[in-house]
Swiss-Prot record:
Mn(2+) 1 binds at residues 400, 404, 460. This is 2,3-bisphosphoglycerate-independent phosphoglycerate mutase. InterPro entries: Alkaline_phosphatase_core_sf (IPR017850), BPG-indep_PGM_N (IPR011258), Metalloenzyme (IPR006124), PGAM_B_sf (IPR036646), Pgm_bpd_ind (IPR005995). The active site is at residue 62. GO terms for biological process: glucose catabolic process; glycolytic process. Substrate binds at residues 123, 153-154, 185, 191, 260-263, 333. The gene is gpmI. PANTHER family: 2,3-BISPHOSPHOGLYCERATE-INDEPENDENT PHOSPHOGLYCERATE MUTASE.
């Protein structure tokens, strides 16, 4: 007998904006999406700020989006949690942070603070770095060095100089800290095992090798002069009198202040993992603190903020009812439909199958805007024909990953490719008498230019996202307005005929 699958399709980075200028979502020719939008119930969901557990006005991101969708409740993000603790003062008694600083003081070694220097709030926040500098000052440390990873992706592409100036002013005011290296996140925060990139960032921080400059401002200005925006700043060692200001040495304490794990793992492993094979390097012995748990298997680090456990996430609850589920995405978003969707748990649920389709190996995705969407679709259709799954979670990475390049024509092509795939998937789900929900985790591709400067915009947005309910049963019905990402899971469970568990505080969006 054919199963009637309930499927959630997440169009990563596909937001809704009334402004047509620089809007790749509006500019794209998307007959399938438009046809479904006009025929079936739809509404808009909030995917940013307080509605997803972020500070007010903070744009959403993929990790936060998938956590909220999978949990069926608002998940207070690490950003909000850490910022709140700094304000309330508990940050300054955090065991792991205090221990790292005490050890540096007792052993008369250096403290290194490494991480993404911006207020983007996706991977890190400059205010958390300032909090660490204040704690170092309170502890009476003098040898405190910052290894700044330049952003230009979650914030404007050439805003790095302003953040360097802001950091230098803060260090002056607090009375501690010097910038030792700067590296574009393209090198320091790779997540695709491109070790030749990571090695350059590592060499700057640990060996004092790489580009040279006499100040961080000089380094970033040179990068701009060479037409390299923040993300692509070559790892640069800041020198005083011809010697590196500092480098990470045995016995030093290191605090990595990024709170998002996926782009923090590789450089962390390069520094601390005794089994590391990415490139040739000598084993360092440092006191290393990760702001959050980057990877359970990293045993040689301390963690400042351990993960909170969420019970009865959508996947866990569906598994507890003896149902089969599938998660499918290409490499770039695979962690999002598995680890993040399951509330930060690596282990698959019982009867949870996973399909990983390799992302194309290109330098930037504007060179291949269709990415692996067609391959993902082919695999999904094959799986649907097996009639095995009660619930399917699918992510199309294109609008987000191509949106991040800032190239509007490519983003338009990305959305057109996804539309083609979306049409095939919708037809197949309807043929199986199933239900398809279409949504996004946050906005991106609907704003491809910075309206204030006219330059390309590479960051996420705070725009709402669509939510479509596609099924034979949905025709002529309607969805509630004013929803948020956390309302998706209760809605899906209702359609599946399951009771919504009490832990899910989201609301079902079906109008009775």
């Amino acid at each position: 007998m054919s199963k009637k699958p309930v499927m959630l399709m997440i169009l990563d980075g596909f937001g809704i904006s009334p402004n047509k200028e620089g809007n790749a979502v509006a500019a794209a020719n998307k007959p399938n999406y438009d046809r479904l939008f006009n025929k079936y119930p739809h509404t808009e969901l909030q995917a940013s700020g307080l509605e997803v557990g972020l500070p007010e006005g903070q744009m959403g991101n993929s990790e936060v989006g998938h956590l909220n969708i999978g949990a069926g409740r608002i998940i207070y993000q690490e950003l909000t949690r850490i910022t709140k603790e700094i304000k309330e003062g508990t940050f300054f008694t955090n065991k792991a942070l205090v221990k790292a600083m005490d050890e540096a003081k007792e052993n008369n070694t250096s403290l290194h603070l490494m991480g993404l220097l911006s207020n983007g709030g996706v991977h890190s926040h400059i205010d958390h770095l300032k909090g660490l500098l204040e704690l170092a000052k309170k502890k009476g440390l003098q040898k405190v060095y910052v290894h700044a990873f330049m952003d230009g992706r979650d914030v404007a592409p050439s805003s790095g100089k302003e953040f360097i100036v802001e950091l230098e002013n803060a260090m002056k005011e607090i009375g501690v800290g010097e910038i030792a290296t700067i590296s574009g996140r393209y090198y320091a925060m790779d997540r695709d095992n491109r070790w030749e990139r990571v090695e350059l960032a590592y060499n700057a921080m640990v060996l004092g090798e790489g580009e040279k400059a006499s100040s961080a401002v000089e380094a970033i200005e040179k990068s701009y002069h060479d037409n390299k925006t923040d993300e692509f700043v070559l790892p640069t060692v800041i020198e005083e009198d011809g010697h590196p200001v500092s480098r990470i040495k045995d016995g030093d304490s290191v605090i990595f202040f990024n709170f998002r794990p996926d782009r923090a793992r590789e450089i962390t492993r390069a520094i601390v993992d005794p089994e590391f094979k990415g490139f040739e390097r000598k084993q360092l012995h440092v006191n290393f603190v990760c702001m959050t748990q980057y990877d359970k298997t990293l045993e040689c680090v301390d963690v400042a903020y351990r993960p909170e456990n969420y019970t009865n996430t959508l996947g866990e609850y569906v598994a507890s009812k003896g149902l089969n589920q599938l998660r499918i995405a290409e490499t770039e978003k695979y962690a999002h439909v598995t680890f993040f969707f399951n509330g930060g748990v690596e282990q698959p649920n019982t009867n949870e199958d996973r399909a990983l389709i390799a992302s194309p190996k290109v330098a930037t995705y504007d060179l291949k805007p269709e990415m692996s969407a067609y391959e993902v679709t082919d695999e999904l259709i094959k799986r649907l024909d097996e009639d095995k799954y009660d619930m399917i979670i699918l992510n199309f990475a294109n609008p987000d990953m191509v949106g991040h390049t800032g190239v509007q024509e490519a983003a338009v092509k990305a959305i057109e490719a996804v539309d083609e795939c979306l049409g095939k998937v919708a037809d197949k789900v309807l043929e199986k008498e199933g239900t398809l929900f279409i949504t996004a985790d946050h906005g991106n591709a609907e704003v491809m230019i910075d309206y204030s400067t006219g330059k390309p915009m590479t960051a996420h947005t705070s725009d709402p996202v669509p939510f479509l309910w596609i099924s034979k049963d949905a025709e002529g019905k309607s969805l509630k307005d004013g929803g948020k990402l956390a309302d998706i899971a209760p809605t899906m469970l209702t359609v599946m005929g399951l009771e919504v568990p009490s832990e899910m505080t989201g609301t079902c969006l079906l109008n009775k």
